[in-house]
Amino acid sequence: MTKLSRINLYKLGAILELATGAALVVCPALVMQLLFGSPLGSGGDHVAQLYGLALLGLGVACWGDSCADQSQKGLMMYNSVAAIVLISFAVRGIAAGLMVWPAGLMHLALGSLMVWDRFSS
């Protein structure tokens, strides 16, 4: 993978996490409804907002042309594990939201590309 492709891969990951994080902070119930197809329980808004803040932090850590190696590893791990969890939830019927499959497959694609980038160089 060329340096420019690598920068764009991690920048795309950062943009997606920043957007998702901001959405979770501003309208957590809507995001969770789209992903899981069910309303949040008591305190769920607060947990979703806290998770949104963590995604904002991850996005900021990977923003720009100089995404540090440790930040790249963190983003790679997050995308890989998020793919497994979201797709597993969808397959088992735990999550039935409109966006669970697209989100799971997006994380799978990004995580796979990041793993390939990490171990092919």
Each model region followed by its residue ranges:
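Membrane-helix boundary connector in multi-pass membrane proteins
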Residues: 64-66, 73, 84-102, 118-120
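Non-cytosolic membrane-interface motifs at loop->transmembrane helix junctions
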Residues: 38-45, 95-105
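Membrane-water interface at the C-terminal end of transmembrane alpha helices
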Residues: 109-121
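Core segments of alpha-helical transmembrane spans in multipass integral membrane proteins
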Residues: 18-25, 43-66, 74-83
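Membrane-helix boundary elements
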Residues: 6-45
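Membrane-embedded alpha-helical segments of multi-pass transporters/permeases
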Residues: 25, 63, 87, 112-115
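Membrane-interface elements of multi-pass transporters and channels
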Residues: 30, 34, 38, 67, ...
